[in-house]
Amino acid sequence: MTLFSSISSISNPMTSSKSIIASFGSGTIMSSNSIACGSGCGGGRGGILGLGLGLGLNLFGGSRGACGGNGGSGNPAQGGNGSCCGGPCCGI
């Protein structure tokens, strides 16, 4: 899905959040892994703000981005894909 690739390249958490919500409206929810790649990179690095903008994927302490696989101690939505944010290796 190129849609998630374009979302993950956005560094502004607010802009990223809006894009992710728009993508949900077009029915592109694939799995928690692919969504984590899209939201974790752009919206997951903003601490508390990022946790909220991650649309529930980073609510388990993952403030550094789910795509990086280093979001926290108990985040079940982590993709564990290494530092692949913005790249094609998010499993989409």
From Swiss-Prot:
Taxonomic superkingdom: Eukaryota
Pfam family, any one: Coiled
InterPro entries on file: HssA/B-like_chaperone, HssA/B-related
Signal peptide range: none
A Gene Ontology BP annotation from the UniProt entry: sorocarp development
Family: Belongs to the hssA/B family.
Descriptive protein name: HssA/B-like protein 46
Natural source organism: Dictyostelium discoideum
UniProt lineage: Eukaryota, Amoebozoa, Evosea, Eumycetozoa, Dictyostelia
